[in-house]
Every structure is written in structure tokens, then in C-alpha cells.
Amino acid sequence: ELVRVGHDSLIGEIIRLEGDSATIQVYEETAGLTVNDPVLRTKKPLSCELGPGILGNIFDGIQRPLKTIAIKSRDVYIPRGVSVPALDKDQLWEFQPNKLGVGDNITNGDLYATVFENTLMKHHIALPPGAMGKISYIAPAGQYSLQDTVLELEFQGIKKEFTMLHTWPVRTPRPVASKLAADTPLLTGQRVLDALFPSVLGGTCAIPGAFGCGKTVISQALSKYSNSDTVVYVGCGERGNEMAEVLMDFPQLTMTLPDGREESVMKRTTLVANTSNMPVAAREASIYTGITIAEYFRDMGYNVSMMADSTSRWAEALREISGRLAEMPADSGYPAYLASRLASFYERAGKVQCLGSPDRTGSVTIVGAVSPPGGDFSDPVTSATLSIVQVFWGLDKKLAQRKHFPSVNWLISYSKYSTALEGYYEKFDPGFIDMRTKAREVLQREDDLNEIVQLVGKDALGESDKITLETAKLLREDYLAQNAFTPYDKYCPFYKSVWMMRNIIHFNQLANQAVERAANADGHKITYAVVKSRMGDLFYRLVSQKFEDPAEGEDVLVAKFQKLYDDLTAGFRNLEDEAR
């Protein structure tokens, strides 16, 4: 239960009741509280206000709007005991009721109106869970604030009024009709993730990595370029300047819509900032606040992705609270219920059939960054997370030091959604699954060969192994590595990823075939050195595939890639003819 503590009315939450004494966790600095200070009960649990005005806003861990507080207090810090409503109650919103009239029956989850939130997102107003009845009044189209009654229901003789706003306790998952199997990929615009380790809309992913490996850059790239409708970005216990960077970057970033309009990314983003210099207790609440907001948009039928950066800090907050309660510590001092808390958070992700009519599906994708101390993946938080999530994008310190970004290690990462997405890939491009398998084999083979090369040198290898090493280098440096700060490579559409991979694998197959055929024939031998010297021009074109700018349009790019594919085939045919 939420309470107000002391004369400053600080926000607190009761976390344990024993006999007639209550343990209260206060979400603010508690200096100056004395014995016999009053405690006011609010008689409701820690809740989130859900309604128009969430998008483009920035909240702290217990949903206090930081912008409004800054304007009111004119201070860089949040004053103690400040009480500001989460959403602006006076702002007017354009309300448009759906085709419902007085006398119609309506139940929880039914969408009864649309509100114009911004040029990018339509905000659907649904009946809150647990409500039902016959409409006795519905407001006509017009402008209303969040305090105005827009709907009145009658059920068993009792009338109940509804505004566009409702509250929901953050620790309770919002109800759904049913959970569905996810079958659409979450396209991130990062080649290594889309092609080798795909996630789905409604999936769970973990990004563990030591400091400086680029976790934050990957989660920001997901917020900027992924194919989800809205993004909730929770900065939980990370540095304050990272949230400041997001606040500076996002309003300037634009995304191009299918109809060619440019819109600011901020219009589809909500930020929950609980940086490392804010109270630890609110850090634990911030993740729940974020997921509740995400579920609210999911219930409208949107695909939402939620970034939690980072869940390790959240686990540390749990450890601290558990220590104050004098509970029995488990591994590394974390509480024994760490794994179940993590699981209860991650299982709120998924693709669902929403309650109510019209029929709609929505999804919540959770991407959790984990920062294990010293990059040690056997840390309790990391191992508990890995037993829950389905996609693991492991970041490697050595790759980051080589300036290979995104530094996802392709030998330890995995995705358990590959089979679920096979249907989608078959439709998109029937040959893609085989190409991906081949690319993985090449990268794995390179890892095996590296030890031999270090012992005896590259020249002692067979011709096909030399070609494998060259293909792996192409894949590594020109396919998996991606520069997030260039216009042509910050976002890579899926068709470009597929075509780039196709041409590299095609080169590998043709080179191997040429070497094998010439070895059995009587003419000149074709060696790796011959291929490299004669194919210099085509090789250069393979390397520079990534410089093709998606802004030119899909047809232009596909034509270029197709021409390279045909030129490769012709080039090797000529080489073989000459060798005869």
C-alpha cells in the first residue's frame, strides 16, 4: 500500500506487515524524519496513471513527470515530498467516440473512443479491466481534459462515471484474453541481430556485456529503428548523462513512415528515468512502471518494445532492500527470490489476444541489458536471466577493443526463435535459411582454423580452408560490423541484409567449386592466390556492398546486388574456362 510519511509527506510503500508494525520503504531521502511523525494512508497500491499524454513524456521511477517538476521547482534536483500528477489534467484532447450509442452493452477491454495524441500515434481509449455495463451517457466528439467524464455506465442499477484516465497497480500484470505464439520478427536494423540471432515481436532478449561494449548503443538503436509501434525506455540505475543523451538525441531523430512523412522518434517513445543518483528503492519500482505502461499500449493492439537498461542495477536494488529487511542472503548476497522476481518480470512479455472488441492482437517485447561486474557471465543475475530469456546477444570485450561494433560475439550468442520464424523467412526469401546455416558454418570453421594458423601460418592450409578464412573475414568485417554513426549503415533493412549475405556465400561456393574442379582437371591449377588476384575488382565490390544507401529505394539496391551476383557467376566461369 502507498503511504505518505512525515510532515513533508514523502512517498513510501508498505513492504512488510508484522503484527501491528509496518515496514515502509520510502522512495525519497529520509533525513529529518523523527519518531511520532504522522503517516497518511492512501488506501491504494503503488499505481500508474494511464491515459493520453504518456508518449513523449519523461517520468521517474514512480511516475512523477520530471519536466513538470523542473518547471515548478526551478531546481536541478527533485525537491522532497513533491506531489505532481503524472499526467497533465488540464490539457485538452481531441476525443472521437467509436460507433457506440446510449443503451449499448460494453465490457472490459472494449475500445470506445480514439484520442488524437500526436501525428504519429492514435491513442485508443478502452474500458478499464473489471468494468462493464450499459452505456447511459457517452460524450460527443470534441475537446475534453482528463478530468471530464466521457462515459457513464449503468450496471445492476449502479451508475459509474469514467474519464479518459485510469490507474492500474504496477505489480499486477494487466489481463489478456489469451497468449499467442509469436511469428513476426523484431527487425532491429542491425545485420548481426536480424540475420543470425533474430528475436520476435513479443520475445524476451538479454544483452549482457562489460562496460564499454556498447549495450546502451544497441538498446538505443532498437528504440530508434525497430519495427515496433511504441517504445518504452527504462533507464534503471544507469548514469544520468546516458538519459540526458537520449533526451537530446531522440527529439532530433526522425523516422520515415510508409507514406514518406518524417516524424520525430520521440512521438512514439516514453522514458522512465531512474538514474544512479536517484533513490535506490524507486529503482525497483521503475521497471514495473515501465512494463505497466508497455502493457497499456499493448492492450490497444500495438507492438511495444521495452528496453530495460540495466536489470543488474534493479537486482542490486532488490539486494539492498532485502538486506535492510534482514532476509537470508543467497548467492553473492542477492535474495533467494531473485530468479522468481526476474521471471515474473520477463513473463509479462509476449504476443497476446487483447480483451474486448474489436478483435486485436498486441505484443510486448522486453530487451534487458545486463551489466555483470567485470564482464563475468557466471554472475547470479546473468545466469538467472539466461535461464529465462529466449534470445541471448552476448557482447564481447575483445571485439569492442578491436572496435568491432555491434560487438555481439557470434560464437556464444543464440536465438531460440529461429524455428518459429521459418515460415516468415520462407515467404520473404526461400533460400535465406540455408544461407544463414552456411554463414554460421563458415564462422565456426574459421574459429577452429585460427588455432592452426597461429601454429603453422596461413600458407600451410589447404586451398578451401584459405577461401573459408577469406569468406569469414568478409562476413566479419563487412557484414557483421556496422557503423551506427553513418547515414548508409545506421539502419540496414532486411532485404539488404539478405542480399549482402547471399552474395558473400555465393562467392564462397563459386570459389570452392572452381578450386575443386581445376584440381581434378588437367589444365592450370586454380589456387586461392589466383582467385584473389584475378577477382580483385569483384572482391572490392563485395566489400563495399554495405556502402549502398537504403534511401535510394529497394528496387535500385536489389538491382545492384543482383548485378553483382551475376557478375560473380560470369567471372568464375571465365576463370574456369581459361584454366582449361
From Swiss-Prot:
InterPro entries xref list: ATP-synt_VA_C (IPR055190), ATP-synth_a_Xtn (IPR031686), ATPase_a/bsu_AS (IPR020003), ATPase_F1/V1/A1_a/bsu_N (IPR004100), ATPase_F1/V1/A1_a/bsu_N_sf (IPR036121), ATPase_F1/V1/A1_a/bsu_nucl-bd (IPR000194), ATPase_F1/V1_b/a_C (IPR024034), ATPase_V1-cplx_asu (IPR005725)
Residues bound to ATP: G209, A210, F211, G212, C213, G214, K215, T216
Gene3D superfamilies with a match to the protein in the record: 2.30.30.650, 2.40.50.100, Bovine Mitochondrial F1-atpase, Atp Synthase Beta Chain, Chain D, domain 3, P-loop containing nucleotide triphosphate hydrolases
Catalytic activity, EC: 7.1.2.2
One GO CC term, this protein: proton-transporting V-type ATPase, V1 domain
CDD domains: ATP-synt_V_A-type_alpha_C, V_A-ATPase_A
Subunit details: V-ATPase is a heteromultimeric enzyme composed of a peripheral catalytic V1 complex (main components: subunits A, B, C, D, E, and F) attached to an integral membrane V0 proton pore complex (main component: the proteolipid protein).
Function as written in the Swiss-Prot or TrEMBL entry: Catalytic subunit of the peripheral V1 complex of vacuolar ATPase. V-ATPase vacuolar ATPase is responsible for acidifying a variety of intracellular compartments in eukaryotic cells.
Family the UniProt entry places it in: Belongs to the ATPase alpha/beta chains family.
Name of this protein: V-type proton ATPase catalytic subunit A
